[in-house]
């Protein structure tokens, strides 16, 4: 499951 990884990537992009 790479859903968690995508959440982290989104967080980094949001910054």
UniProtKB/Swiss-Prot annotation:
Tell me which domain of life the UniProt entry assigns to the organism this sequence originates from. Answer: Eukaryota
The miscellaneous remark of the record is: On the 2D-gel the determined pI of this unknown protein is: 6.4, its MW is: 48.4 kDa.
- Please state what the protein is called: Unknown protein from spot 688 of 2D-PAGE of etiolated coleoptile
Recite the lineage of the species. Eukaryota, Viridiplantae, Streptophyta, Embryophyta, Tracheophyta
